């Protein structure tokens, strides 16, 4: 796997290091609740791409070095057709065997229209006890016929004043 922090360097305490998705989901017309191992909700179409569908040399440093597959809970609400508001709490991608009880939190919004798709999020990833990496991610995808164009903005910091 290309992600150097992927489930503790290829393994995890439960023995599911090579498993990307293992979830149990309840869904109805208005919301869903998911528990298990899934992708961290980062508002980026690049980061949302599955490993085998990505070309290592063309990916960002963030994609290549931060594991998207973590254990946790997520809940989504469908306010209107084609839109989802998501809350998520997972293990932090900075967790290791030595420092395990670190968590990541996400608030994400996905929207789909005829020629435009959005995937925006704000995230907190705990990197040590009491310290968080904060991020704002704005993924925008535009469609014109068979052509697809992604325009994304991501910023991450320890201090908001940076």
Show where each model-derived region lies:
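Detector for outer-membrane/organellar transmembrane beta-barrel domains
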Residues: 107-162
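Surface-exposed coil loops of outer-membrane beta-barrel proteins
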Residues: 4-21, 30-110, 120-124
């Amino acid at each position: 796997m290309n992600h150097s922090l992927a489930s503790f360097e290829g393994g995890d305490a439960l023995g599911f290091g090579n498993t990307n998705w293992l979830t149990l989901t309840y869904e109805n017309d208005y919301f869903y609740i998911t528990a298990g191992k899934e992708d961290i909700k980062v508002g980026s179409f690049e980061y949302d791409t599955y490993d085998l569908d990505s070309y290592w040399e063309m990916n960002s440093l963030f994609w290549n070095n931060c594991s998207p597959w973590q254990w946790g809970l997520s809940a989504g609400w469908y306010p209107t057709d084609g839109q989802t508001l998501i809350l998520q709490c997972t293990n932090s991608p900075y967790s290791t065997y030595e420092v395990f009880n670190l968590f990541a939190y996400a608030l994400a919004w996905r929207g789909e229209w005829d020629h435009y798709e959005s995937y925006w999020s704000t995230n907190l990833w705990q990197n040590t006890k009491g310290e968080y990496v904060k991020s704002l991610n704005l993924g925008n995808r535009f469609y014109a016929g068979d052509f697809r164009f992604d325009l994304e903005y991501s910023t991450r910091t320890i201090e908001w004043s940076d």
